[in-house]
Curated annotation (Swiss-Prot):
Keywords tagged on the record: ATP-binding, DNA damage, DNA repair, DNA-binding, Helicase, Hydrolase, Isomerase, Nucleotide-binding
Family that this chain belongs to: Belongs to the helicase family. Hel308 subfamily.
Taxonomic source organism: Methanosarcina barkeri (strain Fusaro / DSM 804)
Protein name according to UniProt: ATP-dependent DNA helicase Hel308
Catalytic activity: Couples ATP hydrolysis with the unwinding of duplex DNA by translocating in the 3'-5' direction; ATP + H2O = ADP + phosphate + H(+)
Length: 729
């Protein structure tokens, strides 16, 4: 099907022709035939790199140029940024694009001036909770990676959000983009959508198992030269010799870092002089962005043409790795499943070096087929590679047979709603009542019966869980005590602040029960909520943290009995996370924190993001309920954002000054932005360097605000910086 033949405005067709897209892929053509451009709901369950995003673009542009507005929902911030960059190319068509992923207690009415809004599912949910007016103008909703409705962490929010959007705008077109799953037909029926299912790919995908020096596919086999003792290194070298690139998936951060180091010396021998120069530049940028041991190791790997990628790296470091790989300079990335989660980063060959992953409940377990398919889908760059290869590495003949039967020849699992538990449902029950989607019990049940959970389970057990949620919300004062579903001011604020009602209840009880409110008291209160992401306890942590608890017992609202092993161990994890935050706000270096707590720089920022948000909630709840702690929590919120002591906050409002530079200025006697404005710039240049000093004084003495500086952009207070189960690896 030719682009020129589509029922689209001429300027849209010309845009794609100018981009070199003349013809649709077969699955795209099928989608058009099934009503994509006629406003029909559609579920596309097709492989990675088969053109799902183009389907979304065509539907959005058709609707927008007819006066509509589009909402593009993604599961991850990184994916939101990637789509935002792509959609900004539509500016030549007069299309305005906005993005929003944080600040969950804002209505963001300003976003409504845009034609395409890119947002995470959590942000979309918060916009609905805050009754954002422009949401009623949405004519097309795109749900990217909709198979993640199966995720215990993020699936319920995506599911309820889609149900609310369909209820609010019954005529709105829903376009759901999914990996190939076992029950796509069931998902399509729930969405009242046409279904496009296909295994077609623009580049051939060869899936197989590597064993004893040979890559075995279904209908062919290929011998690989054994240049080293590591089979995955040999597979990578084989690809590099043919001008390809490799993604290697590992089961843990430790393993992916170790493999990048192991492969470095071999990969380095394949680099051209031009590659080496470019890689040296990337390595220098890595070191400019971070001074931790991990970033130093990453820079060493990058100079040799390899890299590692996991959620322990900060976003700037991950982006430098991704950009270096896209540019063809980095030849091999060793990654945890972060790169399988929707980002557009394909390679000639994908190597799954370990098909098992650790679970705290069950130990090492095989990954789902769906996750394998997501990894395998990264193989083969459209228009660049003649083919793609997805390779599982077997260590024995028994494992070889297992991998072939359970992955290569297997179909992806069915996806199942995870909404049917009190933990998943209580926040959505409160929000549904608070923003008027349901005013009576019958209306609440009618709404919930429109969810995927009710569709799959025929309402089995739903009323029982709903009643448990309602009893909890009434007991905690978030709903009025009578049978009518009327939210209290407490309940409305909890819903608007986008916090789990259980977290809000714990915060309120903690503030009431605390004898005093030290930094540790408030930090631990935040870390005791279910919204918080906790650090793992290592075997040698227990004694140290237990000793700390004994020495500071009076600063905790409640210390559980050590004889209740499960509860006490969880409590120690809360304390460990609190101590990380305590070091953070007292300006310990990131490298020192990483080494002390056995974590990554990216984890520090992720934990601080979540803690900042919950501390913001704590301040707001204390103010509403007239409890002590509102002022203290508000100050700690700022300190967590910057990772600094209170005396540095004024300096940290200047863009370009971080916690380290602010401390240098303060110790040199420049203790506020007002004092800094009166200083000879040469003195600051001697302290921070001429470039930084120039930027600072342009703000202070140039386009300043009424206070004399340009304040940094407000923090994105988001409890969802990463995706659990995948991005936390």
């Amino acid at each position: 099907m030719k682009i020129e033949s589509l029922d689209l405005p001429d300027e849209v067709k010309q845009f794609y022709l100018n981009s070199g897209i003349m013809e649709l892929y077969p699955p795209q053509a099928e989608a058009v035939e099934k009503g994509l451009l006629e406003g029909r709901n559609l579920l596309a369950a097709i492989p990675t790199a088969s053109g799902k995003t183009l389907l979304a673009e065509l539907a959005m542009l058709k609707s927008i140029l007819a006066g509509g507005k589009a909402l593009y929902i993604v599961p991850l911030r990184a994916l939101a940024s990637e789509k935002f960059r792509r959609f900004r190319e539509f500016s030549e068509l007069g299309i305005r694009v906005g993005i929003s992923t944080g600040d969950y207690d804002l209505r963001d009415e300003g976003l409504g001036v845009n034609d395409i809004i890119v947002a995470t599912s959590e942000k979309t949910d918060s916009l609905l909770r805050n009754e954002t007016v422009w949401m009623q103008e949405i004519s097309v909703v795109v749900a990217d990676e909709v198979h993640l409705i199966d995720s215990p962490d993020r699936g319920p929010t995506l599911e309820v959000t889609l149900a609310k959007l369909r209820k609010m705008n019954p005529s709105c077109q829903i376009l759901a983009l999914s990996a190939t799953v076992g029950n796509a037909d069931e998902l399509a029926v729930w969405l009242e959508a046409e279904l496009v299912v296909s295994e077609w790919r623009p580049t051939e995908l060869l899936e197989g198992v590597f064993f004893n020096g040979t890559f075995y596919c279904k209908d062919r086999e290929k011998t690989v030269e054994q240049s080293t003792k590591d089979e995955a290194v040999n597979l990578a070298l084989d690809t590099l010799k043919k001008d390809g690139q490799c993604l290697v998936f590992e089961s843990s951060r430790k393993n992916c870092m170790a493999f990048a180091k192991k492969a470095a010396s071999t990969v380095k021998k394949t680099l051209s002089a031009e590659d080496r120069n470019a890689l040296a530049g990337i390595a220098d940028e890595i070191l400019e962005n971070s001074e931790t041991d991990t970033s130093t190791n990453l820079a060493v790997c990058i100079r040799s043409g390899t890299a590692f990628h996991h959620a322990g790296l900060t976003t700037p470091l991950r982006e430098l790795v991704e950009d270096g790989f896209r540019a063809g300079r980095i030849k091999l990335i060793s990654s945890t499943p972060t790169l399988a989660a929707g980002l557009n980063l394909p390679a000639r060959r994908v190597i799954i070096r370990n098909y098992r992953r650790y679970s705290s409940e069950d130990g090492m377990q095989p990954i789902p087929v769906l996750e394998y398919k997501q990894m395998a889908g990264r193989a083969g760059r459209p228009r660049l590679d003649p083919y793609g290869e997805a390779v599982l590495v077997a260590k024995s003949y028994k494992e070889f047979v297992f991998l072939f039967e359970n992955y290569i020849e297997a179909n992806a699992e069915d996806i199942w709603s995870k909404l049917g538990t009190e933990n998943a449902l209580r926040t959505h029950v409160l929000s549904t009542i608070s923003n008027g989607f349901a005013r009576t019990y019958d209306e609440l049940m009618d709404f919930l019966e429109a969810t995927f959970f009710a569709f799959q389970y025929s309402n089995f057990g739903l009323s029982t869980v709903v009643n448990e949620c309602l009893n909890f919300l009434r007991q905690e004062g978030m709903l009025e005590k009578d049978d009518a579903l009327i939210p209290t001011s407490f309940g409305k604020l909890v819903s608007r602040l986008y916090i789990d009602p259980l977290s809000a209840a714990r915060i309120a009880k903690g503030l009431k029960g605390a004898k005093s409110l030290s930094e540790l008291t408030l930090l631990h209160l935040v870390c005791s909520t279910p919204d918080m992401r906790l650090l793992y306890m290592r075997s040698h942590d227990y004694q140290d943290i237990n000793d700390y608890v004994m020495a500071h017992a009076s600063e905790f609202v409640k210390v559980p009995s050590p004889f209740d092993t499960t509860e006490y161990e969880w409590f120690l994890g809360e304390v460990k996370t609190s101590l990380l935050l305590l070091d953070w706000i007292h300006e310990k270096s990131e490298n020192e924190i990483c080494l002390k707590f056995g974590t990554g720089e990216g984890d520090i920022h992720s934990i601080a993001d979540i803690a900042e948000w919950i501390m913001h909630v704590t301040s707001q709840l204390a103010g509403l309920l007239d409890l002590k702690g509102a002022r203290e929590a508000a100050e700690l919120e700022k300190r967590i954002h910057y990772g600094a002591a209170p005396e540095l906050i004024d300096l940290l409002n200047i863009r370009g000054i971080g916690r380290v530079r602010a401390r240098k200025l303060y110790e040199a006697g420049f203790k506020s932005s007002a004092e800094l404005a009166e200083v000879d710039p040469e003195k600051v240049a001697a302290l921070l360097g001429p470039k930084i000093a120039d930027r600072i004084f342009k703000q202070i003495r140039g386009r300043g605000t009424s206070s004399g500086i340009i304040a940094s952009e407000p923090p994105e207070k988001s409890p969802y910086s990463g995706q659990k189960t995948i991005s936390d690896y």
